[in-house]
Amino acid sequence: STSEVYGDPEVHPQPETYWGNVNPVGPRGVYDEAKRFAEAMTMAYHRYHGVETRIVRIFNTYGERMRVDDGRAIPAFMSQGIRGEDVTVFGNGLQTRSVCYVSDLVEGIYRLLLSDYSDPVNIGNPHEITMLDLAKEVLEVLASSSAIVHRELPEDDPKVRQPDITLARRILGWDPKVDRREGLIRTAAYFRKKLS
């Protein structure tokens, strides 16, 4: 699943017990509601048919193997910064996200798969950063002199996004290990190679 099930959250950080704040008819609604429906169907099969299931709510993830034209923030910041283009930040950039390096995500999913826990579990790095500061950090890692430009914030874009990983820590003994800056350095090396 995804952290998008929380929509534009009114509870911060978001625990698995929070049901979310989703605009079902907004431009993001189809994706958000599809994930919520998938979770409901998964739990129904688990309850009524005894199917062994796991639900991982993945928060913003980054790392090597991302597509250069992915459209998400880190690939966009990396690609624009490496090419010397203006780096696009939506809105004032004060909306927050918590980005998790891919190897940490994989470890969390692996531990969940090996567990017998069937309810949703948040897997993400709880260290929150504004999108503006994330763009600046990417440019710093790249040693890029690209300018940051602001564009209109898309409708229903969440103002905050931060996982409460208390449950993952308790039942999986999981905690992210890779520091954001270290992850960005590794990701930048990959993007430089892809764009050369």
Pin down the residues of each PLM region.
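C-terminal substrate-binding subdomain of Rossmann-fold SDR/epimerase-dehydratase oxidoreductases
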Residues: P15, N60, S79-S196
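Conserved active-site helix of classical SDR/Rossmann-fold NAD(P)-dependent CH-OH oxidoreductases
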Residues: R36-M43, P75-M78, V106-E107, L132
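Conserved sequence/active-site signature of Rossmann-fold short-chain dehydrogenase/reductase
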Residues: V5-Y6, R54, T61-G63, L105
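Active-site beta-alpha turn of Rossmann-fold NAD(P)-dependent dehydrogenases/reductases
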Residues: S1-S3, R57-F59, G124
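Conserved catalytic/ATP-binding subdomain
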Residues: G71-R72, I129
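Catalytic helix-loop patch of NAD(P)-dependent Rossmann-fold dehydrogenases
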Residues: E4-I55, D69-D70
